[in-house]
Amino acid sequence: MAKKNAKKSKNSSASIARNKRATFDYKFEEKMEAGLSLMGWEVKSIRMGKVNLSESYVFMREGEAFLFGCTIAPLNTASTHVVCDPMRSRKLLLKRKELDKLQGLVDRKGYSIVPISMYWQKGAWVKIEIGLGKGKKEHDKRDDTKDREWQIEKARTMKKAVQQ
């Protein structure tokens, strides 16, 4: 019998949620990967895709990093003896060196820490990508929009030129 391919291709199903607003509002200078401390009902809800990262952010308290504002909606079939708080703050699992670096940059240079995306790693672990950056000004956002529109227009023009 022939062996089946054991390797799985990395596809988009590993992605759970994206914070599209973060890339529009912030200019990221560094990105990091962090684990999340979750409860059982949260993992089940995440598997069902009931996550919203749009209004969430990371804050530092007593030398630890916490994800605040991330909504994980409980399932209707969740047990009755567990109290499900969809908006609770969740601890980020980072190394001490990374925590100290984040704390220093947030305190001294005024950086913000924002979650960018949530995804599965190796099919079992929920990871979150956080970005360390500064907020964009209104003119920066307009410049980005103009650049994006120019790229689209350029692609259309090239497509028309190739078809003729």
UniProtKB/Swiss-Prot annotation:
Pfam families: SmpB. SUPFAM superfamilies: Small protein B (SmpB). The keyword Transcription does not apply. InterPro entries: SmpB, SsrA-bd_prot, SsrA-bd_prot_CS. GO terms for biological process: trans-translation. It comes from the Bacteria. It is found in: Cytoplasm. Its main location: cytoplasm. One of its GO terms (molecular function) is RNA binding. Keywords: Cytoplasm, RNA-binding. PROSITE patterns: SSRP. GO terms for cellular component: cytosol. Belongs to the SmpB family. HAMAP family: SmpB. Required for rescue of stalled ribosomes mediated by trans-translation. Binds to transfer-messenger RNA (tmRNA), required for stable association of tmRNA with ribosomes. tmRNA and SmpB together mimic tRNA shape, replacing the anticodon stem-loop with SmpB. tmRNA is encoded by the ssrA gene; the 2 termini fold to resemble tRNA(Ala) and it encodes a 'tag peptide', a short internal open reading frame. During trans-translation Ala-aminoacylated tmRNA acts like a tRNA, entering the A-site of stalled ribosomes, displacing the stalled mRNA. This is SsrA-binding protein. It comes from Shewanella woodyi (strain ATCC 51908 / MS32).
